[in-house]
Amino acid sequence: MNSQWLEGTVRHRRKYPVQHEFSYSTGMLALDTDEWDTVSGVSPLFSLERFNWISLKRRDYFRPDTGDLSVAVRDHVEEATGWRPDGEVELITHPRYFGYVFNPVSFYFCYRSGERPADGVVPKVIVAQITNTPWHDRHVYCLETIGAEPNQAGWRTERFGFSKRFHVSPFNGMNQHYEWTFSFRGPDLRIHMNVLEGDRKHFDATLVVQRTPLNRKDVHRSLRKFPLEAFKVVAGIYWHALRLKLKGAPFYSHPDKLPEDDSAYRRGHDDSGLDVTSSETNDKIRGRVSSWRT
């Protein structure tokens, strides 16, 4: 089985106009999407399309009305980049826990033929599926890597800078841009995101995880360690939102509630492959990014 489990930590830091920080341990699934129909066989506590301790449902992921998830992602990447993934398409996500899930972001790592994610290879394309709450809108960014060489510590790092096209948090406005960094080294994975407005950093988030085997023993160990991960994620979102409100963080309305001639309303509404690669970031930022309304 190619699918794996990921364990590590998440950290969020709000820098401006109020300061706020938290971190927590987490467990996630790294699913070879071609194993969608068979991965649940690893444990009686894991099911497909039905209730269990952990489960997967097709409707939670990219283009749920198109059937096979792997094919849907490959079709989209081909449309967005002209290259059809001929290797593994790996989904990084939280599964459902007792029937519930909320993923602020799920990643699809698209590899070339013969490449193994466990070797720390950089995927040729990364698709980021963003979901906001409580609206549950979805948006996709398609990131094209350039094939970074390893540094002295063995990390291969890809950097992207692009304009924000989707309302995620009521505590972040739309007039912002992102710097995303993906670093790969063997079983280790790091993802870092900066949120900036002009030259000022408002927020950053970091995910640091390590790959572990996806077998019955390790799944059960992870469930003991992270028994209610999906509930923890969404409870944390609302708890820290309350704390931000009490600290006086400014509140931004959903763009759909704004006049249609407002720039915040227009951003993202008509995106269908728009190149949003930012010119505001430094010369270390590389890789093309396109934005897709879904």
Where are these regions (language model features)?
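Mature, function-bearing regions of proteins
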Residues: M1-T294
